[in-house]
Amino acid sequence: THTFNAGDPDCLAAVRETTQGGVEFAFEMAGSAKAMELAYKITRRGGTTVTAGLSHPNALFSVPHVGIVAEERTIKGSYLGSAVPRRDIPRFIEWYQAGRLPVKRLLSEHLVLADINAAFDRLAQGQGVRQIVQFP
């Protein structure tokens, strides 16, 4: 897993170089039309762009129609991870307890509530991407 700064003018080139032509899956989580367009651009032929960020109800994004068809790309929406909490949360707990859900590998940081402001600063700098906040 890699993290790239979408605001970097060389982001698209960096992703394509790192992934040898684009990613198989791109996830847009910010609810930004600009981020959605970039997420689409970084996918390779046959790739899937998933958007889960909620934007303004009238927000639009633009992608070339021919790319969807000729490059066989998919754009998919996901609300709350397409999860059904009553069904899925017990399943996730079971997987975690059985060692099948490597939560610790997915974390960039574990912190206490008192450190929340510093954590937001790190998040804004792209350093703390997946954080768990422990409440007292």
Describe these PLM feature segments.
Residues 3, 26, 43, 49, ...:
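Hydrophobic packing within well-folded, soluble alpha/beta domains
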